[in-house]
């Protein structure tokens, strides 16, 4: 028959309890030794009996294992900081290497430092440049087509606005012609003003003759608008009086 399952509870009999402790202690120490040998693990085992007696096992020494345990468990913040620093250092190293590679690639694309490249690397570089040039030309053509389409759209919009304005002007002209009124264009007033100004530009005024005085000079030709006639007339009359006195002086 198989061995039955042992019920896990305190053994009341002191002799049986001591025998069980001895057997299981030896088995536990044996298993710790086997684990350290088979798996190359650092094992430390400490056992205190019910009477306070110490039993221990350490594959690398109890003291050394305890010191290592204290460094790992009693100072977790320091360990975390050290691990974080190491992680950041590795990340910086990776980024630095990537940055140097990108700088080297950029110099190659600019045609610099090509002496160290092989024929195959130069061919790959040539293909990259041709691909980049093709993409740049394609993008430029796309932008030009978009600009042309935008200009065509604006042209169509302006054409529609022009047609609407022509229709509106035609309707207004038709309404004025139907009512028998003149066309109220701004330039019609300008033409009328120009006609009036042209008709009043040249005026010939004969001065009044005095039969009691001697013969006066020939009629005076005055050129200008009506608003300047008053001032010119006053100055002209004064000049005529002076000339009349001179003529009378010669006559005497």
From Swiss-Prot:
Record's description of how this protein is used: Attractive locus for facultative parthenocarpy leading to the production of seedless fruits.
Cross-referenced InterPro entries: MADS-box/MEF2_TF, MEF2-like_N, TF_Kbox, TF_MADSbox, TF_MADSbox_sf
Motif segment (Nuclear localization signal 1): 8-15
Loss of function: phenotype: Parthenocarpic in a temperature-dependent manner, thus producing seedless fruits of normal weight and shape under heat stress (at 38 degrees Celsius). Normal pollen viability and sexual reproduction capacity at ambient temperature, but slightly paler, narrower and longer petals.
Residue ranges of every copy of the K-box domain listed in the record: 85-175
Residue positions of motif Nuclear localization signal 2: 138-145
Tissue distribution: Restricted to flowers.
Statement: the UniProt record of this protein carries the keyword rRNA-binding: no
Major site of localization recorded for this protein: nucleus
Residue stretches making up the MADS-box domain: 1-61
Keywords: DNA-binding, Nucleus, Transcription, Transcription regulation
GO molecular function: DNA-binding transcription factor activity, RNA polymerase II-specific; protein dimerization activity; RNA polymerase II cis-regulatory region sequence-specific DNA binding
GO terms under cellular component: nucleus
GO biological process: positive regulation of transcription by RNA polymerase II; regulation of transcription by RNA polymerase II
Subcellular location: Nucleus
Chain coiled-coil ranges: none
Functional description taken from the UniProt entry: Probable transcription factor involved in fruit development. Key regulator of the transition between the state of 'ovary arrest' imposed towards anthesis and the fertilization-triggered fruit set.
The protein's name in its UniProt record: Protein AGAMOUS-LIKE 6
UniProt organism field: Solanum lycopersicum
